[in-house]
Amino acid sequence: ILFIPDPNLGGYVAKQLPEKQFAFYHGGCPRHIVCSAADVAKARAAHPEALLLVHPECRPEVVEQADYVGSTTGIMAYAEKSDAKEFIIGTENSIVEHLSYVCPEKRFYPLAVQLTCMNMKLTTLMDIYHCLQGSGGEEIILPQDVMQGAGRCIRRMVELGG
């Protein structure tokens, strides 16, 4: 399996599928890869009662120390349902803000200060609204031969994937 774009997420998935062979592309989320074991130690020292919830795109040494590893949606659901009252969140900082809003009786701390993703902030609610209305964004029309070639590749990947 050629796993792109993130080798950290790919490695996490590969551990769950040991019967498969993986090749990883050297890319990754610039926010998640900045989290380090030192950040975990610092956050746990500052908040010893807090559970550590991280995204699997974090470095393996961070993921290995987590109390929960999951998607952004999974992290939010875990924190909302948990009886714990404090959490260290290892994903984009807007999740800390969201959880603080929906669970005001709980405390949420970012794993690292540099987890704000400016690229994610480029898309606004109005952008999404306009897109859903069909009036936003740029329409890209590909040549028929490009679409046919890409379609063959996609169909073959689906066939091989079972």
Regions found by a protein language model. Give the residues of each.
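The feature marks the mature, well-folded catalytic cores of soluble enzymes
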Residues: 1-162
